[in-house]
């Protein structure tokens, strides 16, 4: 009994092992996707030879492995050296080895995965921007000593915004504070921060800019290491204070800013002087001026008395001639010295008087501000304790006005006394 297989089960040609391997090699090595491919995984083993580094890359959660090789001539070009147990990202191409019927990844570059990759990118960008001179101390600009308008770039919902407002109003009443709102976390934060800085530039009123946010995880601060944000700070026409709430590492925004501190409150303290401290300093200088004048006058009186005693001890005629010359010389010298000292003290006193006048709370009232008091004289600082019908007294620059509360509006429905939100 015979059995005949249908002809269709036997193709006209049958591939040899070499032919099949060559076919697979052609498919893999000529595939454009595999000529330059990025692969990530964990290094499970590594062996160093004269010809190069041989290691295995695998997925930690799966039983899948890929043999890899870095030729000796390429080792020095790697950003990191693959070490067993570490997560890496590899760049290379697929090569087939017919003798063993295997394929391998021929590696050109190795990068750290996860946080290691972020750190590598940070170092590379920092080095490039430093080479351009963006972090050069010579680029740093001094802060204005007495700014009248300050812009703040931060999130309106962030605690940093409240901290900055409270600090500025306490240290420098009457200061104009402009908020240019921005996202300070997430993928959209870099573009949002750049747009907020550009709005401040276009508005043109601010004399200094505070870029701030509260503390957070390292990944939350990534937007402050973005190249567009760094260049926007560098190109800003007014001094920039970076008040980013972190202690461990400096962001690139810190390095390029004119001044940087670690908290929003510290940034606000740095932006404006304390008026109370300025007044104390003025009083001290005035006391010093008065003391110096009194000391100079007492010295002149002592010199005059000394010359008078010498005059009495000389013969009359000779005494008159000598003392006349001495008195004339002393008089001329005294007049010149006192005149110079007096002119210097008067000029200094005028400067101090002008500064004191500019810091006088009454000058703030003359610019259109008012102080609201209850009937018992208590100053109102918030609407939270007000009720409709309450009687108030408004202190203006030239008198007082008795008013009654008819309607209470929250900050979003009216104008704030010391801060306003930019809608540009």
Curated annotation (Swiss-Prot):
Instruction: Fill in the subunit field for this protein.
Output: Heterooligomer composed of large and small subunits.
Q: Which residues form a coiled coil?
A: none
Q: Gene encoding this chain?
A: xseA
Q: Which GO terms describe its cellular component?
A: cytoplasm; exodeoxyribonuclease VII complex
Keywords from the UniProt entry: Cytoplasm, Exonuclease, Hydrolase, Nuclease
Q: Which InterPro entries match?
A: Exonuc_VII_L, Exonuc_VII_lsu_C, OB-fold_nuc-bd_dom
Q: Which HAMAP family match?
A: Exonuc_7_L
Task: Tell me a Gene Ontology molecular-function term this record carries.
Answer: exodeoxyribonuclease VII activity
- EC number(s) per entry: 3.1.11.6
Source organism, top-level taxon: Bacteria
* EC main group: hydrolase
Subcellular location per UniProt equals:
Cytoplasm
One GO BP on record is:
DNA catabolic process
Protein's name according to its UniProt entry: Exodeoxyribonuclease 7 large subunit
Q: What is its main location?
A: cytoplasm
- In its UniProt entry, the species of origin is given as Cyanothece sp. (strain PCC 7425 / ATCC 29141)
Provide the family line. Answer: Belongs to the XseA family.
An example Pfam family from this entry, by short name, is tRNA_anti_2
């Amino acid at each position: 009994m015979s059995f005949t297989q249908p002809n269709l089960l036997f193709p006209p040609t049958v591939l040899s092992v070499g032919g099949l391997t060559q076919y697979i090699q052609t498919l893999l090595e000529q595939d454009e996707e595999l000529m330059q491919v990025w692969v990530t995984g964990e290094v499970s083993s590594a062996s160093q030879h004269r010809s190069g580094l041989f290691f295995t890359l695998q997925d930690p959660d799966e039983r899948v492995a890929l043999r890899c090789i870095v030729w000796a001539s390429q080792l020095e070009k790697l950003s990191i050296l693959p070490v067993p147990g570490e997560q890496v990202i590899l760049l290379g191409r697929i090569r087939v080895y017919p003798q063993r019927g295997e394929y391998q990844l021929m590696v050109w570059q190795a990068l750290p995965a996860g946080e290691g990759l972020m750190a590598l990118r940070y170092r590379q960008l920092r080095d490039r921007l430093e080479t351009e001179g963006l972090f050069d101390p010579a680029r740093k600009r001094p802060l204005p000593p007495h700014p009248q308008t300050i812009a703040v770039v931060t999130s309106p919902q962030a605690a940093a915004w409240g901290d900055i407002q409270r600090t500025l109003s306490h240290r420098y009443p009457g200061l104009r504070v402009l908020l240019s709102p921005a996202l300070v976390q997430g993928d959209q934060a870099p573009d949002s921060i750049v747009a907020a800085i550009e709005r401040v530039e276009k508005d043109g009123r601010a004399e200094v800019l505070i870029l701030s946010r509260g503390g957070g995880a390292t990944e939350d601060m990534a937007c402050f290491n973005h190249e567009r944000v760094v260049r926007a700070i560098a190109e800003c026409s007014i001094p920039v204070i970076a008040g980013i709430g972190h202690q461990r590492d400096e962001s690139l925004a810190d390095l390029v800013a004119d001044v940087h501190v670690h908290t929003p409150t510290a940034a606000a303290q740095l932006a404006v002087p304390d008026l109370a401290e300025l007044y104390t300093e003025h009083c001290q200088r005035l006391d010093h001026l008065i003391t110096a004048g009194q000391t100079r006058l007492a010295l002149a009186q002592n010199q005059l008395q000394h010359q008078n005693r010498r005059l009495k001890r000389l013969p009359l005629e000779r005494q008159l001639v000598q003392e006349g010359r001495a008195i004339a010389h002393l008089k001329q010298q005294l007049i010149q010295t006192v005149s110079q000292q007096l002119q210097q003290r008067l000029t200094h006193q005028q400067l101090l008087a002008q500064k004191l006048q500019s810091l006088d709370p009454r000058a703030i009232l003359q610019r259109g501000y008012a102080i609201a008091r209850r009937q018992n004289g208590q100053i109102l600082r918030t609407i939270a304790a007000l009720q409709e019908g309450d009687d108030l007294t408004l202190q203006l620059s030239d008198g007082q006005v008795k008013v009654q509360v008819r309607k209470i509006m929250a900050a979003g429905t009216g104008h704030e006394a010391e801060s306003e939100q930019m809608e540009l």
